[in-house]
């Protein structure tokens, strides 16, 4: 059993047994009913990527390719355009969060509001981060924050779930490692937990490659970790499943010091990944 599988089962059990019920919940199911959930607060996990510990479960298949494409949409394209996400990456699941009548920051008609990539572009976040790390890798101010109150007031839209990432550099012997800490306000445990984690591992790997560093540790903090009330059957099924006997890891197949903006989604490869099937179905809360 991988570390991710152990943490996954522990969190499911804790939510089901100790979690409390949501109140005044915002999300809705597609039929218009309120999407209530059981949740815990203050979830934390640590993975040492340099030792092959990756935050992806083997208990069900995870759509890692689409997840990584979303990272490129946010941090390379730096846009909120649903047209870019669909036409360039063939990713469609963000359509449920389209904000009608709000154009994208690149002029396209369809957007998710002033969120995610639009905020990255507005503050030139990636270029500033890379410049800081270039000037002084050991500085302690390497922060990506997507929490922009001005943007929230400017347009409607889903406020970012994974909203803050911090980076630190460590030298161990002759090797330099890049660590990352992801902070998330809210996480749908069964659907999005490993998707979000692996997205930001991919971002960590892209930044490390840009400088020719090794990937180090990945820290993951979630303020509200929940399971929706229409997912309890799937939760029980996941607890019953025996994990696959594999050790999945994400590989970025580009040379060291490849420019961040020259890396492509197809440069990533998930190896030794043989998840348990069949896939489970989930009705998303919007």
Swiss-Prot record:
MF (Gene Ontology): thymidylate synthase activity
Pathway(s) annotated for this protein in UniProt: Pyrimidine metabolism; dTTP biosynthesis
Amino-acid positions noted as binding (6R)-5,10-methylene-5,6,7,8-tetrahydrofolate in the UniProt annotation, renumbered to this chain: 188, 285
Enzyme class label: transferase
Binding site for dUMP: 140-141, 185-188, 196, 226-228
Cellular-component GO terms for this entry: cytosol
Residues in the signal sequence: none
Residue stretches in coiled coil: none
GO biological process: one example: dTTP biosynthetic process
Main localization of the protein described in the UniProt heading: cytoplasm
E.C. number(s) listed in UniProt: 2.1.1.45
Domain of life: Bacteria
CDD domains: TS_Pyrimidine_HMase
Statement: the UniProt record of this protein carries the keyword Nucleotidyltransferase: no
Keywords: Cytoplasm, Methyltransferase, Nucleotide biosynthesis, Transferase
Substrates-to-products reaction catalysed: dUMP + (6R)-5,10-methylene-5,6,7,8-tetrahydrofolate = 7,8-dihydrofolate + dTMP
Protein's job: Catalyzes the reductive methylation of 2'-deoxyuridine-5'-monophosphate (dUMP) to 2'-deoxythymidine-5'-monophosphate (dTMP) while utilizing 5,10-methylenetetrahydrofolate (mTHF) as the methyl donor and reductant in the reaction, yielding dihydrofolate (DHF) as a by-product. This enzymatic reaction provides an intracellular de novo source of dTMP, an essential precursor for DNA biosynthesis.
HAMAP family: Thymidy_synth_bact
Protein name: Thymidylate synthase
Organism for this UniProt entry: Streptococcus thermophilus (strain ATCC BAA-491 / LMD-9)
Protein's gene: thyA
């Amino acid at each position: 059993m991988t570390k991710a599988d152990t943490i996954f089962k522990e969190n499911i059990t804790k939510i089901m047994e100790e979690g409390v019920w949501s109140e005044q919940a915002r999300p809705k199911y597609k039929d218009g009913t309120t999407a209530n959930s059981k949740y815990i607060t203050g979830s934390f996990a640590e993975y040492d990527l340099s030792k092959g510990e990756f935050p992806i479960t083997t208990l069900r298949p995870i759509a890692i390719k689409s997840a990584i494409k979303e990272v490129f949409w946010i941090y390379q394209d730096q846009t909120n355009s649903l047209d870019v996400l669909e036409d360039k990456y063939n990713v469609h699941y963000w359509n449920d969060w389209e904000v009608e009548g709000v154009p994208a920051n690149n002029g396209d008609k369809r957007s998710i509001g002033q969120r995610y990539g639009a905020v990255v572009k507005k503050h030139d976040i990636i270029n500033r981060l890379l410049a800081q790390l270039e000037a002084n890798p050991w500085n302690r101010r390497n922060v990506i924050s997507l929490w922009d109150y001005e943007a929230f007031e400017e347009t409607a839209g889903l406020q970012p779930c994974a909203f803050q990432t911090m980076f630190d550099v460590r030298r161990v012997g002759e090797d330099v490692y890049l660590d990352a800490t992801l902070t998330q306000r809210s996480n749908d445990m069964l659907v999005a937990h490993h998707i979000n984690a692996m997205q930001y591992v991919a971002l960590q790997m892209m930044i490390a490659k840009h400088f020719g560093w090794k990937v180090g540790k990945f820290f993951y903090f979630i303020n509200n970790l929940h399971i929706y009330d229409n997912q309890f059957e799937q939760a029980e099924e996941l607890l019953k499943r025996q994990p696959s006997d594999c050790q999945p890891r994400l590989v970025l197949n580009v040379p060291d010091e490849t420019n961040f903006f020259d890396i492509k989604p197809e440069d990533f490869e998930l190896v030794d990944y043989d998840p348990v099937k069949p896939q489970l179905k989930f009705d998303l809360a919007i």
